[in-house]
Amino acid sequence: MRYIFLLAFIIAAAYSAKVKDLASVIGVRENQVIGYGLVVGLSGTGDGSSSKFTIQSIANMLQSVNVKLSPNDIKSKNVAAVMVTGRLPAFARQGDAIDISVSSIGDAKSLMGGTLLLTALKGVDGEIYALAQGSLALGGSVGRGGNHPTAATIPSGGIVEREVAYDIATATNASLSLKNSSFDTAKKLQDAINAR
C-alpha cells in the first residue's frame, strides 16, 4: 500500500504544471523594437542610384566619422538600406543578446554576404532599448516560395541597452491571464496559489 501511495505521489508531481506554463502576468510581455540601418559589403547587389535615402544615409554615416563626401559622389551598389527589428523579452537585462531580423527597404537584389552596421533599436516610446550589428545569415528556401535574399537574421545580433521596468516586487497584487482559458484550470490555479 505504501508503494502505491508513493507511486501516485510521483505521478501527480510529474504531471503538475507551473503557474508560468498556465498563465502570464498581465502587463508583463515582450516588446518590439525597430530601427533603420545600413548593410554593407554586398557584392554589387545593394541599392541602386534610385534609392536616394540610401545614398543620403551613406553620406550621413560617413560624415559621422569625419569623412566629407557629396551624395553625388556616392555609388550604393555595395550598400542596402534596411529595417531592423527585434523582440525584447519580458525581464530582459542590460547586456542580454536578442535575435535580430533585417529586411531591405530599397531595391537591393540580395543581402547575402552583408554586414549590418551599428543600428539603434527603439521602442514605441522613442527610447533606445537595444543596439544591433553583425554578419547576416540568409535562410534557405521557404516552402514553394523560394529564397528571400532581401531578408535575413542575425542570431544574438542585438544587445539590450535599456531594461523595461516592471514593478512586480513592490506590487500588492497581480492579475493573471490564462494561456488556455477554462473555468476548471482557473479554479485549480486559484486553489494552488491560495494554498501557498
Regions found by a protein language model. Give the residues of each.
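Mature, extracytoplasmic segments of signal peptide-bearing proteins
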Residues: 1-4, 15-196
